[in-house]
Amino acid sequence: MKNITILGATGSIGTQTLDVIRKEKEELKLVAISANKSYKKVIEIIKEFKPKYAVLMEENAFKIVEDFCVNSKIDTKVLKGMEGMIYISTLEEINTVVTSVVGMIGLVPTIKAIESGKDIALANKETLVVAGELVISKAKEHNVNILPVDSEHGAIFQCLRGNKKEEVKNIIVTASGGPFRGRKKEELIDIKPEHALKHPKWNMGRKISIDSATLMNKGLEVIEAHFLFGVDYENIKVVVHPQSIVHSMVEYKDGSVIAQMATPDMKLPIQYALNYPNRKESQIEPLDFYKISNLTFEKPDMDTFLPLKLAYEAGKKGGVMPAILNGANEVAVDLFLKGKIEFLQIGDLLQECMNKFYKSMEATLENVISVDKEVREYLGKKYDI
């Protein structure tokens, strides 16, 4: 039996993780959850799974859930804020922490969980993007597995198993291309949030959907792959694959390319991470090769989708530059969703902040938190948010 904590239990990945646990109750036990403010969903989770702990970040939501548990005579202990997230990430009984919160908020709990010897099922891209070197070194120090939950890194992880790192030539990360695949910059001038939120293949949260539309999501995955698999940026390629059947590939120096293929369903990488190193019965629809008409691959347009290009630049620059990129992107996406900036301005703001805030300094926890704060305060004042 593996005991599980889910950080971000009410979001897209968290909800699908619950689906996996629901079907594997003999092997997986939900011990603790966290959420921001979705108290109705948290109450439903508590009713069904009866976790020992639930953490809410927002004060009002915390009080509502706490009152519910007291009045319903449910034993779930309700905690609040970052202290609560760290507490449920470091519980002695926990084997695996699923980090599916979005943004920088997942960084500190993830590091604390690693220091406590917990395996990490990582769905929070930002953690590795802003502090990849620190996270990977701590994982090695504490003999902890970092198990990628997203489909691309989960695919690469599987393609690498049983092979030697020195035999790898290239990692090939596939991208659906998002809702605006094939469009040129002039065709993206009047894009509204409702257009960008309509992903052709995946059902995701709002922030990740916008990142997919700008190809920033793929840029973050490139940086993540660099740290996860120890591969130079020159050897990490992005290929647009609109069918989303091939989830990523590894090219070896002898010319062999190993690909991981599956129906596009996040429950597969979640299930693989939670059960690693074992495989369990499938919870997804199997591939029917007779129904797949074709598989196509295209080169990404980095001039139109500037964030992908900037992610490569930030990764190669290293230090705190990925943290600057990430902080600027989180704010820019929020500004776009609120109608304060245009779609193409997202890339412009990333470029502006990378130029303005870069300092030659090591990506320590203190430094990345500091530069992230600077970027957010600057954009907050600029746009009065």
From Swiss-Prot:
SUPFAM superfamilies: 1-deoxy-D-xylulose-5-phosphate reductoisomerase, C-terminal domain, Glyceraldehyde-3-phosphate dehydrogenase-like, C-terminal domain, NAD(P)-binding Rossmann-fold domains
UniProt-listed Enzyme Commission number(s): 1.1.1.267
Binding site for 1-deoxy-D-xylulose 5-phosphate: 125, 151-152, 176, 199, 212, 217-218, 221
Pathway the protein takes part in: Isoprenoid biosynthesis; isopentenyl diphosphate biosynthesis via DXP pathway; isopentenyl diphosphate from 1-deoxy-D-xylulose 5-phosphate: step 1/6
Cofactor(s), names only, from the UniProt record: Mg(2+); Mn(2+)
Gene Ontology biological process terms from the UniProt entry: isopentenyl diphosphate biosynthetic process, methylerythritol 4-phosphate pathway involved in terpenoid biosynthetic process
One Gene Ontology MF term: NADPH binding
Catalytic activity: 2-C-methyl-D-erythritol 4-phosphate + NADP(+) = 1-deoxy-D-xylulose 5-phosphate + NADPH + H(+)
Domain of life: Bacteria
Key words, A-Z: Isoprene biosynthesis, Manganese, Metal-binding, NADP, Oxidoreductase
Amino acids binding Mn(2+): 150, 152, 221
Residue ranges of coiled coil: none
Residues holding NADPH: 10-13, 37, 124, 126, 205
Biological role: Catalyzes the NADPH-dependent rearrangement and reduction of 1-deoxy-D-xylulose-5-phosphate (DXP) to 2-C-methyl-D-erythritol 4-phosphate (MEP).
PANTHER family (alphabetical): 1-DEOXY-D-XYLULOSE 5-PHOSPHATE REDUCTOISOMERASE, 1-DEOXY-D-XYLULOSE 5-PHOSPHATE REDUCTOISOMERASE, CHLOROPLASTIC
Family per record: Belongs to the DXR family.
Family annotation (HAMAP family): DXP_reductoisom
Protein name: 1-deoxy-D-xylulose 5-phosphate reductoisomerase
Source species of the chain: Clostridium botulinum (strain 657 / Type Ba4)
Lineage, broadest ranks: Bacteria, Bacillati, Bacillota, Clostridia, Eubacteriales
Gene label: dxr
